[in-house]
């Protein structure tokens, strides 16, 4: 069975989404807290086939990636940034999927907040 780990869901929203029912056929674990250090993360992620990152909250360094031999896919909510060692993923045959979005929405929100302050 595929082991899916969803990290850093601080507000416990993933399980409340309608699409969360799609995880029912998998061994999926959602973490609402965080751990620090490569050792603690390696223990938490040791059986993961798939890791879902909520934003850039948890860094996945080469040192950590090398401790996760079962890992096949990292899905990043939003754009993959410097918190994720993409080259290490490539070197270890781990696929990286990143979310894309419209750059317009953040710009619109910024202007709405500016105008609200006036």
Label each region the model flagged.
Residues 1-49, 54-55:
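N-terminal glycine-/charge-rich "phosphate-binding" loop or analogous flexible N-terminal tail
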Residues 50-118:
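Phosphate/diphosphate ligand-binding glycine-rich loop within oxidoreductases
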């Amino acid at each position: 069975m595929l082991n899916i780990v969803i990290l850093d869901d601080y507000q416990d929203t993933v399980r409340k989404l309608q699409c969360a029912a799609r995880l029912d056929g998998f061994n999926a674990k959602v973490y609402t807290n965080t751990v620090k250090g490569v050792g603690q993360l390696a223990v938490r992620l040791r059986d993961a086939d798939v890791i879902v990152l909520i934003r850039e909250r948890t860094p996945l360094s080469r040192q950590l990636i090398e401790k996760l031999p079962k890992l096949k896919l990292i899905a990043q909510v939003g754009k993959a940034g410097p918190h994720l060692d993409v080259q290490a993923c490539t070197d270890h045959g781990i696929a990286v999927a990143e979310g894309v979005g419209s750059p317009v929405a953040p710009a619109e929100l910024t202007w709405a907040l500016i105008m609200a302050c006036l």
